[in-house]
Amino acid sequence: LKRINKLIKNILRTPFEGIGKPEYLKADLSGYWSRRINDEHRLIYGITKTDLVIISCRYHYAK
C-alpha cells in the first residue's frame, strides 16, 4: 500500500515520467499508462484535465 501511495503522489506531480517506469499502453488500453508496483503488479491509470483515473492496481494488465 505504501508503494501504491508513493506512485499516486508521483503521478499527480508528473503523470508521464518518474518512478515505476511509466509506460504508455497500446491496443485495448490505449490512452492509459502503467507503472510498476512490483514485478507482478502494475498500476494502470489515465489522466484527464482534472482527475487521475485508476483502473487497476493488481496483476500485469489483466488477469
Where do the protein language model's features map onto the residues?
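Enriched for short, Lys/Arg-rich terminal
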Residues: 1, 6, 16-19, 25-26, ...
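Acidic-basic catalytic patches of nuclease active cores, encompassing PD-(D/E)XK
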Residues: 12
